[in-house]
A protein has these predicted regions:
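Conserved N-terminal helical subregion
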Residues: 2, 42-183, 226-239
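Glycine-rich FAD pyrophosphate-binding loop
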Residues: 2-37
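Conserved mid-domain beta->alpha element of the FAD-binding
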Residues: 9-10, 26-27, 151-152, 208, ...
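Acidic/histidine metal-binding catalytic segments
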Residues: 60-61, 246-261, 320-325, 338
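Histidine-centered metal-chelating micro-motifs
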Residues: 157-158, 177-179, 204-207, 288-289
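A short coil-to-beta-strand element that immediately follows conserved catalytic motifs
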Residues: 171-175, 191-195, 237-240, 248-266
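Short helix-loop capping/hinge motifs at secondary-structure junctions, enriched
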Residues: 184-191, 214, 227-228, 274, ...
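Active-site substrate-recognition segment that forms the wall
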Residues: 194-229, 246
Length: 352
């Protein structure tokens, strides 16, 4: 998460600018809640949040699911379930949290302000490369800005990665996701329990879990596409197009009369990078690698990045280049493992 980078590196007296695709027009802007935006925080992510002293607020704003329940998409027939509340806490020492993304952003933004970190949004920052300079500079609002360290967190479509890390190529987009949040009011009983539900289908699957916000349930539908998928950040589609794409069970389809806006997202993948560092620039989060989201590790991966980066800088405070190279080596190894498991999960979830 961009905001976690700000907080952690600020504590190490870092000088940092974060090029970002996010825009905060108003703290009270609730537009984000119209989209499916649930996230899952596992033990590693919660560890970082504890170090930021915000874990308590995150836990209070989310829920700790009791079970992982498996279903056949056809007829919503139960396959089995696994207790995860106590199992995960016993194994990893921390609980598994499901919550709304906007709530986590709000908590981190409040922490940034409390620590008096200066942050500026609505500013496009692009890389400025010159052959005779050892470091990359920032071009922003017509000005050249020099910084010791630039942390790039501008997402799967990272402009910085395209310019500076040209060797990292995108994989062909073959899958897409539909996301939205529904009130549990008119949903079947299987969605009303405090569980993560995983529904298997042929070449597709969907996941649901509570977000802790006014009884809202997060729905994420993923499927393999037969044809070309537009390489856009998101695309607004009609409810009928979504229903036609998924051919949902009639029981579930009848639960969607209140759905007015559905967004279709291309699942953008990139090749495993050899390095996520060049000169004074490092990639974090989805900017480092776009991968199949079949481990629900997007937020955790970004939180891990911020923690590892800060610790590497702390270890080598007088040798930034060495610190960044160590960060890159550690994170690339981790990304390789996450990508491998995510691709395996795709085969399992899609019954292949």
């Amino acid at each position: 998460m961009i905001l976690s980078d700000l907080i952690i590196i600020n504590r190490n007296d870092g000088k940092i600018i974060l090029p970002s695709k996010f825009t905060f027009k108003d703290e009270k802007d609730k537009a984000i809640k119209k989209e499916g935006a649930g996230i899952q925080i596992t033990s590693n992510g919660l560890f970082v949040l504890e170090k930021l002293h915000v874990a308590g607020a995150v836990i209070r704003g989310g829920l700790k699911p009791d079970n992982l329940c498996l279903f056949d998409e056809d007829g919503l027939k139960s396959i089995g379930s696994l207790e995860i509340l106590n199992r995960l806490k016993y194994r990893y020492g921390r609980s598994f949290i499901a919550l709304h993304r906007s709530h986590l952003i709000k908590i981190l933004l409040e922490k940034v302000k409390a620590e008096k970190i200066k942050i500026s949004f609505d500013s496009e920052a692009l890389p400025l490369l010159t052959q005779d300079e050892h470091c990359v500079s920032i071009f922003c609002k017509g000005e050249k800005i020099k910084k010791d360290l630039i942390v790039v967190a501008d997402g799967v479509g990272s402009k910085w990665k395209k310019i500076i890390f040209k060797e990292i190529k995108k994989r062909s987009i073959s899958q897409s996701a539909y996301r939205f949040v529904l009130s549990k009011k008119n949903l079947p009983p299987i969605f009303l329990k405090n569980n993560v539900n995983l529904f298997f289908g042929r070449g597709r699957h969907f996941v649901t879990y509570p977000t802790g916000v006014n009884g809202a349930i997060n729905f994420v539908f993923c499927k393999r596409e037969k044809g070309h998928v537009a390489n856009d950040w998101k695309d607004k589609v009609s409810k009928q197009q979504f229903l036609d794409d998924f051919e949902l069970d009639e029981t579930l389809e009848a639960c969607f009369p209140s759905v007015k806006t559905i967004y279709k997202w291309p699942i953008i993948e990139s090749g495993i990078p050899f390095s996520v560092q060049k000169k004074n620039v490092v990639l974090v989060g989805d900017a480092a690698i776009g991968m199949l989201p079949y481990m629900a590790q997007g937020a955790n991966k970004a939180l891990e990045d911020s923690w590892v980066l800060a610790n590497c800088i702390k270890e080598y405070p007088l040798d930034l280049e060495k610190a960044l190279k160590k960060y890159s080596k550690k994170r690339v190894k981790r990304l390789q493992k996450l990508d491998q498991v995510s691709r395996l999960n795709e085969k399992i979830y899609h019954l292949e």
